[in-house]
Every structure is written in C-alpha cells, then in structure tokens.
Amino acid sequence: MREKIRSTTVICVRRDNKVVMAGDGQVTLGGEVLKSSARKLRRLYNDKILAGFAGSTADAFALFSRFESKLEQFNGNLSRSVVELAKEWRTDRVLRHLEALLLVSDTKSTYLVSGNGDVIEPDEGIVAIGSGGPFATAAATALLRNTKLSARRIVEESMKIAGEICIYTNQNVTFEELE
C-alpha cells in the first residue's frame, strides 16, 4: 500500500489592488517530514501570473507545464487558460490521474483549478488549498472582514495560524506578490 504524501498550505488573498500568494515548505510522507523548504509557488507568463500547488510535486510540475502552454496559446488570458486546462485535465486519460490542486492569479482574478473540472473564483478574494487550507481561509476571512491589514499581512498571519494548527504545514513560508 502506497503511503499518501501530505502537504501543505497555499493561500492567495486580494486587497486594494494587490495580490499575495504564499505557500509553506513542508512535505510529509506518513509520519515523517521529508522536506521543510519545498517551493510550491511559481511566477508564470512573464511574471504576470502567480501559481501555487498542493498535492504531488511531479503532478504539479506536469500541470504547470500544461498551464503555461495554455497561457501562451491564449495570450495570457487567465480565465480562458484555466477553463481549457480544467477541460483537458478532466478528459485526458493520463492527466485525469494527476493528484494536485492549483491556485492561479493575476491582477484581476484568482482561481482554484482541480482535476474534477472545477474552476472556482472565490467571492471574497480569498482561497486556500492543502491540508492547512481551511485554517488559513478562516483566519484570512476574519482578518479581511474585520481589519485594515494589507493583503501581505493577512497572508502572513493566516499562514502563521495554519502552521500552528496543521501538522502538515510549517512556518517556512514563501511569498509572491502582484500589483
């Protein structure tokens, strides 16, 4: 029986025309931390698009490659690219078995993309994936609704809280920003 690789928390928050995405660095197999400094975020399409993943690293890299091809094909049109990626991911016999979730964002939109064909744009400009995603989402939602903190500070605090609660999330956090 194959043990499941568990990881991570990746979050994206939009506020005041700024987009901040962050991901922790922990990769866990069973009860063992395999790596504490994994990089789960990428800048794509001439640094105009942020992307993060949760799930299998090899699968995520395969998806990043496909997604970059879609961005080139559709001249950086994020919404069209994510819809086409989701369609291909769901219908392709090989891609269908990939185990990962993607968060992608530009200055106008943020999307969660899954292999089930889901393309979700969050209502409040907050979305998080991975085992710590629900904790980070809850913290970010409370901070966005009740404070004037910047998107960066909201993401920092949300990742800190997720790392304190989720055993598959650490405090070694990488950030990417767009304005």
UniProtKB/Swiss-Prot annotation:
Its EC number is 3.4.25.2. GO terms for biological process: proteolysis involved in protein catabolic process. GO terms for molecular function: metal ion binding; threonine-type endopeptidase activity. Na(+) binds at G163, C166, T169. InterPro entries: ATP-dep_Prtase_HsIV_su, Ntn_hydrolases_N, Proteasome_sua/b, Proteasome_suB-type. Keywords: Allosteric enzyme, Cytoplasm, Hydrolase, Metal-binding, Protease, Sodium, Threonine protease. CDD domains: protease_HslV. It is an enzyme of class 3 (hydrolase). The keyword Hydrolase applies. Allosterically activated by HslU binding. Its main location: cytoplasm. Protease subunit of a proteasome-like degradation complex believed to be a general protein degrading machinery. HAMAP family: HslV. PANTHER family: ATP-DEPENDENT PROTEASE SUBUNIT HSLV, METALLOPROTEASE TLDD. Belongs to the peptidase T1B family. HslV subfamily. This is ATP-dependent protease subunit HslV. It comes from Solibacter usitatus (strain Ellin6076). The lineage of its organism: Bacteria, Pseudomonadati, Acidobacteriota, Terriglobia, Bryobacterales.
